[in-house]
């Protein structure tokens, strides 16, 4: 095993000028992440300088077998924490050979919204709180839980310390450092209310880059859990009953919200979100009705509400924002399996263009 480990960690910099680029894209379910690698002649820092590539869309549920070619367009580059050196991770979106975005390419429409002059001048910032649950590989049950049984009730696990409370911290810390190495704007991590459940935060990040970074952070988490023999679940309610679900709260602000008088702009934006509550809920993740019950720090899925420091509301305004009269708000409705391209662009579209 030592030879294998040595080869996996081999530094290519002194041996060749070539690099490895891992192309990443979203598969047919809209939640599965795919990737494959190719050799490039030298370092690349600009995604527009990278070659387009293709893959077999019939094997990802994104094309028919008789016309299976789907084209990858490189969109963002990150440093590769696994191969290190000049090797890179490349976030891509997917198109037909004719150049049309395929149905699961949600980035394309998001980029159009973020490039709208009225949106661009507002410089929308996002902070995504990505919750997830670490599951035992063969039994689909959270790590640290007795198979077929339950741990003690919630209470000691949120931000907890100790082997009986913080289950999976080695994976969480490895992911944290991998994100920092890659150049992702990860701003923190914490243990969540349900044991085996964790959260990382990405942001503040502006515009389309928020979606790119959350997707690559998810990719890194999938790779690290792959190495650890653990499954990462983004199910919004992985365990029924008196256990917290998993969300992806979206903190949001625009330039006018961050400036003096911004609180009134925030209130108007929240009013616009209320008018389109059903449309947003429909786009905020699969199975969210199991999570948004009005319990476990959620609002009821059928009712829009907002409040200051209220974690049982659809939208929360922080005490600091209220005190300073400017800042940001938190949309608490998105599920952990939401598409960040969809959620971030939809919030901008509703609050700025709506």
UniProtKB/Swiss-Prot annotation:
Keywords: Acetylation, ATP-binding, Cytoplasm, Ligase, Nucleotide-binding, Phosphoprotein. Belongs to the glutamine synthetase family. GO terms for cellular component: chloroplast; cytosol; cytosolic ribosome; plasma membrane. The modification N-acetylserine is found at residue 2. This is Glutamine synthetase cytosolic isozyme 1-3. Induction: By sucrose, glucose and fructose. Down-regulated by ammonium supply. It holds the Pfam family Gln-synt_C. Changing residue 49 to Q: 3-fold increase in affinity for ammonium and catalytic efficiency. It catalyses: L-glutamate + NH4(+) + ATP = L-glutamine + ADP + phosphate + H(+). It is found in: Cytoplasm. Residues 106-354 form the GS catalytic domain. One of its GO terms (molecular function) is structural constituent of ribosome. PANTHER family: GLUTAMINE SYNTHETASE, GLUTAMINE SYNTHETASE CYTOSOLIC ISOZYME 1-3. The gene is GLN1-3. Its EC number is 6.3.1.2. The modification Phosphoserine is found at residues 2, 48. It is an enzyme of class 6 (ligase). It comes from the Eukaryota. Homooctamer. Low-affinity glutamine synthetase. May contribute to the homeostatic control of glutamine synthesis in roots. GO terms for biological process: glutamine biosynthetic process; nitrate assimilation. Expressed in the pericycle in the region of mature root. Residues 19-99 form the GS beta-grasp domain. InterPro entries: Gln_synt_N, Gln_synt_N_sf, Gln_synth/guanido_kin_cat_dom, Gln_synth_cat_dom, Gln_synth_gly_rich_site, Gln_synth_N_conserv_site, Glutamine_Synthetase.
